[in-house]
Swiss-Prot record:
Protein name: Translation initiation factor IF-1 2
PROSITE patterns: S1_IF1_TYPE (PS50832)
Cellular compartment(s): Cytoplasm
The keyword rRNA-binding is assigned to this record: yes
Residues in S1-like domain copies: 1-72
Self-association state and partner proteins as the record states: Component of the 30S ribosomal translation pre-initiation complex which assembles on the 30S ribosome in the order IF-2 and IF-3, IF-1 and N-formylmethionyl-tRNA(fMet); mRNA recruitment can occur at any time during PIC assembly.
Keywords (A to Z) from UniProt: Cytoplasm, Initiation factor, Protein biosynthesis, RNA-binding, rRNA-binding
Gene Ontology annotations for the cellular component aspect, listed alphabetically: cytosol
Keyword rRNA-binding annotated: yes
Any GO MF annotation of the entry: rRNA binding
Gene encoding the protein: infA2
Main function: One of the essential components for the initiation of protein synthesis. Stabilizes the binding of IF-2 and IF-3 on the 30S subunit to which N-formylmethionyl-tRNA(fMet) subsequently binds. Helps modulate mRNA selection, yielding the 30S pre-initiation complex (PIC). Upon addition of the 50S ribosomal subunit IF-1, IF-2 and IF-3 are released leaving the mature 70S translation initiation complex.
Similarity section: Belongs to the IF-1 family.
Amino acid sequence: MAKEELIEMQGSVTEVLPDSRFRVTLDNGHQLIAYTGGKMRKHHIRILAGDKVSLEMSPYDLTKGRITFRHLPGRGPGPSSSGSR
């Protein structure tokens, strides 16, 4: 599946489930089960109930998603792509 087909949404984690899965409520009220993406798992990014997250969903199965970013309070809306390093 190409990346252009993915749907990106925002939501908040309502429940932490076993096996690195989370129940997420989207901003439009829809609930789904999401898992952490590979880089988040690799770098041990912790996600707790109440965290605001960005996630990707397939248009073919809107009940599952992959968490791609955890928004920190007091930061901007998403990952910055400024190459100032």
